[in-house]
């Protein structure tokens, strides 16, 4: 009987009692990770404090030295006492084994449960048991997930490094073998004494011969001298300092650098290149990467500019060989890390591109902070060490004359500074390794490119939009860059010209970084033979190397002469030709005269010495006024439509701001009362009234204006052709019959712009 009862009991236990007990065990195991550890008050001396590193560039610490920090501790103030509460028990470190929880009241139940669980591993499993077994403690599942994740991550990193080695090794060598026949003849580069790897990369870039600035500066830089290089825009200044930097990197033992990174230390970059604008920094990065693309092993080049992730840039700087950046973001990253600023003090090259802009008075304070941080005196146990002693300083720009930075408008002395005065100005701003750096000026007579033709269009102040549209229509298949002095002008001109069905792209400093890069990419990716127009502020004036820009139009007279030089330098780059047109209003005559006098003073002086009467440097562009007057109605309609859209957006933003401010103050907001109170007849009242009229324009009125404009754009402008006798030879009849697009009916050669490109 005993045996039968025991068998019956076991059957009952297996069918009825096992599942509740199993739930109980699993419930207990499930509840253990959720249970919070008891907190306890500990003494401050028993905590694991660690010292805080204070940045070296911290000017005034005011006694904040020897700081220490601790993590995972709550600070509670109890009256006048401060208590430190931690959740980590002290016995947790000492006893690593299982904790003794006492004897269980039913010790056999756990063994039975374990036995049943062992049996339940057979294929036939009840549904309830499957569900219960899938439920595991969160802590255990988390640990199980973390371990394979870390292992996979390590495997990916190792495989990635192996793949990179293969890619930069064998595949790069194969690519080099395949592309040797496609390269250009680089025999003229041989006198510069470059390595075979660099010569091969130059051949793949198809640069047959060095430019004047490259031939003059590369040997001096390779010899270890500090160099100040001056050359016209588009003369290849980027490779003038990029080639020696890569040569130096190739000569340095790469195994030492890889070992240093493997030990967890921050890598010391070989070169730091400073740029005034983000677009120029990204362009410099691309040019150096293109130079290194043909090498078997290439340096890691990274750009540090605003508008992108700071944390990602910090990670890139720790392994970078060549750093290109703007002063603001670069100083933000360097000043936050003591290791980075110490590593950057060991750079071999400091390059300042567009130095006249970076070193101008009242601008780029961060650049000054970077120079001081690199030259900061360190006091060690062994003695005093000055950082950055061994580095070369390379300075490049198209304009070094300090007099070109003076404003053209207003009263004041407009005398030109000499080369010696400009050099003294640079010596004050930068600390060169040599007492007097090598000053190389390959075009001392003129700052303008040789293939550039300059023209001026005189018009009324209120007709600039009309003449700008006329000039753009006269270049239907050319890539045009329009410069303005203000962001508001870019925002106004872009929608107006878009209403006139022109492919217009905007670029200014208040756009987010991705939008700025997208605008430059869209402008550069336009097909040759198709019109592409970029309206930009001076952010696009310096350094941007966009091939195929045929015409540069200055909507406003630049504020300074050096801005005009760099704006005009976006065209006629290298050996190509280009056209720079200045739209001048009557009130801009005085600044224009000063501009021409400053930019072409050296060329005029040289002409007088030779006994010549002095040539005309800026030609007057005579447009056909009849054709311009026929375009007036188009421009007026497009301007009304664009102004209405902008006024509604602007007033909507102002209303939102005023309404939000009124809500924060707890005041009732009534826009009509504010408008009545703000009505005045003083300066600016006319502009306010026009904005109000544009805002009150209804959708039906805007649609009517768009319909009128569409009808006008569908018709061609008659350039003097008798429409009764259209086949007299002045009209392309085949083009009309085939439906070819065009804005003019008749020939447009006599408009006064094209002959400038052919004049000498």
Swiss-Prot record:
Ranges spanned by the short sequence motif Q motif, renumbered to the chain: 187-215
Q: Which GO terms describe its molecular function?
A: ATP binding; ATP hydrolysis activity; RNA binding; RNA helicase activity
SUPFAM superfamilies listed in its UniProt record: P-loop containing nucleoside triphosphate hydrolases
Q: Does the keyword ATP-binding apply?
A: yes
| Residues that, per the record, bind ATP | 231-238
Q: Where is the composition biased (Acidic residues)?
A: 93-107
> Spans of biased composition, class Basic and acidic residues?
137-161
Q: Which Gene3D superfamilies match?
A: P-loop containing nucleotide triphosphate hydrolases (3.40.50.300)
Provide the Gene Ontology terms for cellular component.
Answer: nucleolus
List the residue ranges of the region (Disordered): 1-43, 88-167, 676-699
Q: Which reaction does it catalyse?
A: ATP + H2O = ADP + phosphate + H(+)
**PROSITE patterns in the record:** DEAD_ATP_HELICASE, HELICASE_ATP_BIND_1, HELICASE_CTER, Q_MOTIF
Assigned EC number: 3.6.4.13
GO biological process per UniProt = rRNA processing
Q: What is known of its domains?
A: The Q motif is unique to and characteristic of the DEAD box family of RNA helicases and controls ATP binding and hydrolysis.
Q: What does this protein do?
A: ATP-binding RNA helicase involved in the biogenesis of 60S ribosomal subunits and is required for the normal formation of 25S and 5.8S rRNAs.
Family membership = Belongs to the DEAD box helicase family. DDX24/MAK5 subfamily.
This chain belongs to which protein, by name?
A: ATP-dependent RNA helicase MAK5
Q: Give the species.
A: Pyricularia oryzae (strain 70-15 / ATCC MYA-4617 / FGSC 8958)
């Amino acid at each position: 009987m005993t045996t039968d009862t025991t068998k019956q009991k076991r059957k009952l236990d297996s069918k009825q009692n096992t599942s509740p007990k199993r739930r109980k065990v699993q419930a207990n195991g499930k509840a253990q990770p959720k249970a919070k550890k008891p907190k306890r008050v500990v003494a401050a001396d028993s905590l694991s404090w660690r010292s805080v590193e204070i940045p070296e560039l911290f000017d005034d610490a005011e006694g904040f030295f020897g700081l220490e920090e601790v993590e995972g501790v709550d600070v509670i103030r109890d009256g006048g006492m401060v208590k430190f509460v931690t959740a980590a028990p002290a016995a947790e470190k000492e006893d690593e084994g299982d904790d003794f929880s006492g004897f269980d009241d039913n010790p056999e139940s756990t063994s039975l449960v374990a036995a049943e669980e062992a049996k339940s591993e057979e294929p036939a499993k009840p549904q309830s048991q499957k569900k219960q077994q899938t439920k595991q403690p969160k802590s255990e599942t988390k640990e199980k997930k973390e371990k394979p994740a870390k292992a996979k991550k390590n495997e990916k990193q190792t495989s990635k490094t192996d793949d990179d080695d293969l890619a930069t090794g064998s595949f790069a060598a194969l690519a080099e073998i395949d592309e040797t026949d496609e390269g250009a003849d680089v025999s003229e580069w041989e006198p510069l004494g470059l390595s075979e790897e660099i010569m091969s990369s130059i051949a793949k870039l198809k640069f047959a011969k060095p430019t004047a600035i490259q031939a003059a500066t590369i040997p001096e830089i390779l010899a270890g001298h500090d160099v100040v290089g001056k050359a016209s825009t588009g003369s290849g200044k980027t490779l003038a300092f990029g080639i020696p930097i890569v040569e130096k990197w190739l000569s340095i033992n790469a195994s030492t650098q890889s070992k240093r990174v493997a030990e967890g230390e921050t890598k010391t970059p070989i070169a730091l290149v400073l740029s005034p604008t983000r677009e120029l920094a990204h362009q410099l990065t691309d040019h150096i990467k293109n130079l290194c693309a043909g090498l078997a092993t290439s340096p890691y080049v990274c750009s540090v500019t605003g508008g992108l992730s700071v944390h990602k840039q910090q990670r890139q700087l720790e392994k970078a060989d060549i750093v290109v950046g703007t002063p603001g973001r670069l100083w933000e990253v360097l000043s936050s890390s003591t290791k980075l600023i110490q590593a950057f003090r060991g750079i071999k090259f400091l390059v300042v591109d567009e130095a006249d802009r970076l070193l101008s008075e009242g601008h780029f304070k961060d650049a000054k902070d970077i120079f001081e941080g690199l030259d900061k005196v360190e006091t060690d146990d062994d003695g005093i060490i000055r950082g950055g002693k061994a580095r070369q300083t390379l300075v490049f720009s198209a304009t070094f004359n300090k007099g070109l930075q003076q404003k053209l408008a207003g009263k004041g002395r407009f005398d030109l500074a000499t080369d010696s005065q400009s050099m003294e100005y640079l010596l004050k701003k930068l600390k060169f390794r040599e007492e007097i750096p090598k000053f190389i000026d390959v075009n001392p007579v003129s700052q303008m490119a040789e293939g550039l033709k300059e023209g001026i269009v005189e018009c009324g102040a209120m007709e600039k939009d009309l003449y700008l549209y006329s000039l753009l229509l006269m270049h239907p298949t050319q890539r045009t860059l329009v410069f303005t002095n203000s962001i508001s002008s870019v925002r106004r001109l872009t929608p107006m010209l878009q209403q006139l069905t022109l492919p217009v792209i905007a670029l200014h400093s208040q756009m987010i970084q991705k939008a700025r890069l997208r605008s430059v990419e869209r402008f550069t990716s336009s097909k040759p033979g198709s019109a592409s127009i970029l309206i930009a502020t001076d952010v696009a004036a310096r350094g941007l190397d966009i091939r195929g820009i045929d015409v540069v139009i200055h909507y406003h007279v630049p504020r300074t002469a050096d801005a005009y030089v760099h704006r005009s330098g976006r065209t006629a780059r290298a050996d190509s030709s280009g056209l720079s047109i200045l739209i001048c209003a009557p009130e801009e005559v005085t600044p224009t005269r000063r501009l021409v006098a400053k930019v072409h003073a050296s060329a005029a002086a040289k002409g007088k010495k030779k006994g010549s009467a002095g040539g005309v440097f800026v030609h007057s562009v005579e447009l056909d006024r009849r054709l311009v007057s026929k375009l007036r109605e188009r421009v007026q309609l497009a301007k009304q439509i664009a102004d209405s859209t902008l006024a509604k957006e602007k007033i909507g933003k102002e209303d939102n701001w005023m309404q939000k401010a009124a809500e924060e103050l707890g005041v009732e907001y009534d826009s009509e009362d504010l408008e009545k109170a703000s009505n005045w007849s003083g300066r600016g009242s006319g502009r306010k009234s026009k904005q109000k009229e544009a805002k009150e324009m209804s959708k039906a009125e805007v649609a009517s204006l768009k319909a009128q404009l569409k009808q006008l754009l569908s018709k061609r402008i008659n350039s003097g052709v008798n429409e009764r006798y259209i086949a007299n030879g002045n009209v392309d009849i085949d083009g009309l019959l085939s439906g070819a697009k065009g804005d003019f009916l008749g020939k447009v050669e006599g408009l006064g712009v094209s002959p400038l490109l052919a004049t000498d």
